[in-house]
């Protein structure tokens, strides 16, 4: 039996789509030196090659892909977006505005200089910034711009062409810049990280090991009674001295949870909870020949829970003010926007931050009720909320503004982004509403993006040879300029106007570019995870601004003449 593969693919859009995705994802795993191509560029390259052979898919699939992607971007940004916008993120907001704004202006200028159309210009901006949200925002605005169908088709083809030609340029140039730009300043990143670590009492080890607390039991002997000198537990401050706290006491055969007024007596058996190294540092009066193995005394349920910061008495306060150890709880991690932060007593908590806390189940539940709620470890997505806010986003996108003879619409990209932000924000405030497991959110976002990339590549593939020959050299120059010049401007602004610590500044710059590979290089150079503080500060707001930049470049273009 003979099978004509070309006819088979042309006759089945779904089969063609998944063939493109599978081949593109395989290609995306290839590495050029230390740089991995990545899923987006892999799918785009494969779709462009097949597009040259005149394969195509229904545009409805492309539209659904970008809608899912941009909605999920909003959901991820929602918990932190308003806190960054309105409160303690002024510097991070300004950095993101400078980065995105300067790139937008430079792209507009180069597009006019080289005589490109809006499609090539917007695609070059998206590729140079390695930002799919720019591509999505520009594409959606073009479709709702009301231009003639022939011009629209050409602009959309050039949009994906510009993106494809400059994406790798933008990615590689930023990675190289992240490696060498820190060396051109007077203060190296490691020194900057150590400086802010001393100021804030940070752990600068990027690979800090996290241990769970363990329970050990000891019998109180003469040495320990003498060591306490008649003081009660509150006066002794055992945690401050040892890093362990007394969870239970057995006295005369009776188990009890001690309060601060309890005084240790000869023959008491005490259960101490602490990290392994804290037990190792205990005074010999605790340990020497005194350890006991009492099943009832040691029978405690030590749990590790992820607590989402929500309550007003925790939001805006410093980490040290929570006094977790005074409540018998141990802090393992602080996570913001999926980025692990250094455990810094001076970190100001934002709504939606996640604290990984260990301790007795009862104590962890108490502290969770005080500062927020325990994250739901469920694999069930609230599809009703997902669909409802998706519909709201589409309806917002239909809103059109009329100014004399000029009109423009909000568009699906901005509408869905706003609706996603609202869903993410409400989820951070109401734990039982709109729950979407992070794995499910990542899957939908990635799948939507890959479908969108496959669609734009197949649409643009037929004209790539002509486009490459006409503008290839110009694209190379423009891609480098738009990728690197805003980074330099952002560095100068942050260093000499905002006077930011260099480790935080470089992390914030990579967050404003939403580039995780470059962020890893900055952390390696600093030998610290302190730059993650800056990265998390700009990442959420930059995703939103980049989407708006894609919309703005299309709106502004006709007015430039």
UniProtKB/Swiss-Prot annotation:
Localization, UniProt: Cell membrane
GO terms (BP aspect): potassium ion transport
TM segment ranges: 8-28, 32-52, 66-86, 94-114, 158-178, 383-403, 406-426, 447-467, 475-495, 540-560
Recorded superkingdom: Bacteria
Keywords, in A-Z order: Cell membrane, Membrane, Repeat, Transmembrane, Transmembrane helix, Transport
GO cellular component, one term: plasma membrane
GO molecular function: monoatomic cation transmembrane transporter activity
Keyword Transmembrane helix (UniProt): yes
Protein name: Putative transport protein YbjL
